[in-house]
Amino acid sequence: MLFYITVTVLLVSAQAKFYTDCGSKLATVQSVGVSGWPENARECVLKRNSNVTISIDFSPTTDVSAITTEVHGVIMSLPVPFPCRSPDACKDNGLTCPIKAGVVANYKTTLPVLKSYPKVSVDVKWELKKDEEDLVCILIPARIH
């Protein structure tokens, strides 16, 4: 019996992701990557005065012709906007719009971690939106260092 419990715990741990889905309504998130951090990390350490690259593989459940990006740092339940270099996700982010339903798309962009950011723990909320509705919504636990 102890063997089965141990195997179950190991399988669940092996499948653990460093991000959580916070309401992806119009797409299925396939994978998320953050430069320099493995998927089994508990949090991402973001160094101030540097850049971090994020990639999100997803498949929309509906045809999509335009996607906007919103990024927030959530500190004590308060969302603080992060600067987004390209809010139009269909430009310079690896996406070719329109995207057909069921087709896996790869979004990739770079986020500046400004020197002015305080050294705090934060949940990075990354949203890709279609007509103000969440196509993709993920939360990434991070620590700004």
Swiss-Prot record:
InterPro entries: Ig_E-set, ML_dom, ML_Npc2-like, NPC2-like. SMART domains: ML. It is found in: Secreted. One of its GO terms (biological process) is intracellular cholesterol transport. Disulfide bonds join C22-C137, C90-C97. Glycans are attached at N51. It comes from the Eukaryota. The keyword Glycoprotein applies. GO terms for molecular function: sterol binding. Residues 1-16 form the signal peptide. Its main location: secreted. Pfam families: E1_DerP2_DerF2 (PF02221). GO terms for cellular component: extracellular region. Keywords: Disulfide bond, Glycoprotein, Secreted, Signal. Belongs to the NPC2 family. This is Ecdysteroid-regulated 16 kDa protein. It comes from Manduca sexta (Tobacco hawkmoth).
